[in-house]
Amino acid sequence: MNFILKSLGVLFILLTLFAYTRKEDIVSAYNNLTTLKQVITTVPLEAQYTLGGEVISMDQFDLRERMERELLINAYHHATTIQHIKLANRYFPTIEKILKENNVPEDFKYLAVAESSLRNSTSSAGAKGIWQFMSNTFKEMNYEISDDVDERYHLEKSTQAACDYLNRLYKRFGSWVSVAAAYNTGPTSYAKYLKEQNAENYFDVNVSDETMRYPFRILAIKTIMENPEKFGYHIPEEDKYRPLDDYQLIEVDSTIANLADFAKGEGISYRTLKIYNPWLRSSTLKVNKDARYELKVPVLESESK
């Protein structure tokens, strides 16, 4: 028995030494890492924020916690936030110009980020494009969705549609914060919430979790993207995605049976044609009588790389 106990004791000591040595090795290896290291902390909250020129004070605990939640999520959603900053360099100049022309606050460019991360994505509900329009809403605004064309993917036209829709919501609700909420949940649902709860504004109403978060998500994205370095994001200008503005417009008034052949004739690849014109949804472009389309064609494909 004594032999067994002594053997177990020796084994325990050896295992302890082995474990200690491995721990030291691990700590040493970590300290020598040259990869990204993080300091995880909370995020600073301002006393107030503005959305569309409307002041949102953080003097209520509910508002502070909702804002902090979105700041934390977006500040530490590293890959997505980096891509937001990079893609903004490509798309914001066009979006800002159209917002200004339509008297929509520039802050609403961040709504596009909240909706789609500035990508021509499709939601689980079927909303599409950077501004995430549903097909019925978009068609009602006299924009085209067909087998060959979906203007929800057209940056300029979808942004114009967004401005028309946002201004319509502002005329109805009289507040840009409410506009953001109504854009998310739908104007009919939002108006119903206000009426049923005798609420005068967005901050007094209890809506779905998604809509409770939505304006604060826009605010958080705005806060981080306006001051990325404050949140630890250091993206050199040369690393941002360049605007796709090196093109000429080609007017098309007759059907193109094969867009790949059209692209080749213009000296570009089919892929490049689709990058510059994501609203082209098939390999053909049917042009009805009296219809006209403008295709963006880069001057030289080599210059667009």
What is the meaning of each model-derived region?
Residues 126-147, 161, 166, 190-193:
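Substrate-binding/active-site groove segments that recognize
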